Amino acid sequence: MGQKVNPTGFRLGIIRDWTSRWYDDSPVISEKIKQDHIIRNYVLARLKKERAGIARINIERTTKHVKINIYAARPGAVVGRKGEEINNLSQELSRIIGKEVKIDVVEVIKPEIEAQLIGENIAYQLENRVSFRRAMKQAIQQAMRAGAEGVRIRCAGRLGGAEIARAEQYKEGKIPLHTIRANVDYASVTAHTIAGTIGIKVWVYKGEVLVQRIDAIEEDEMKKMKDRRNDGGAKGRDSRDNRSKRRSRSKRS
């Protein structure tokens, strides 16, 4: 089943977090989901010319404002000169959704192992008539040099302008899709070429992360147990003191 399911959705709530973090139980929840979709599409279209290398966009909501975290390989292209670009973008989004928008830009330290950026880079090369084999092999080599433990790239469509569509893939290292503790980054990108559209799928294995999560959970549980014991000890001492006071009062009477 791990071969078919989306690796990101398969790991949500365990080692991966949601890109939209907010809660609402009102009937207008569908409108907010639609707004998130509009925000992401607008930001990507707005910054496409600058080639900022946007890996992902996280959205958080409060009652008063909407906070957007943009993870970019080139944060300077998002911010602009003296913050002009990011201010204009926040104002435009505020007009669209009718709420105050706050934007934070986070730099992606290793863009070579971000699946979304790898897919976009391959799509850009295919649209500029670069050989698909060369683009795929170069992307895999760069990712493995940057520290990835495994990479798999699959391209499907009229590759090289062929009349009959086909699919080809290249792989290096290991990609444990069934292992939930495996941090597998996944992205799907479409390249619009003269011959037609080419679908690009990228899997990047960055190592296991659940061991650290288990340790953190165990530490939290130990702290809670200690707090309970301390609270129980304090309550026990208080009850013993109260009993001794009652006994002394009864003896005096």
Swiss-Prot record:
Organism: Chlorobium chlorochromatii (strain CaD3)
Entry's family note: Belongs to the universal ribosomal protein uS3 family.
RNA-binding keyword on record: yes
CDD domains linked to this entry: KH-II_30S_S3
Hydrolase keyword on record: no
UniProt biased composition (Basic residues): 243-253
Entry keyword set: Ribonucleoprotein, Ribosomal protein, RNA-binding, rRNA-binding
Segments forming domain KH type-2: 39-109
Free-text function comment from the UniProt entry: Binds the lower part of the 30S subunit head. Binds mRNA in the 70S ribosome, positioning it for translation.
Protein name in UniProt: Small ribosomal subunit protein uS3
Compositional bias per record (Basic and acidic residues), positions renumbered to this chain: 221-242
One of the record's GO molecular function terms: mRNA binding
Recorded superkingdom: Bacteria
PROSITE patterns: KH_TYPE_2, RIBOSOMAL_S3
Name of the gene: rpsC
UniProt-annotated stretches for the region Disordered: 220-253
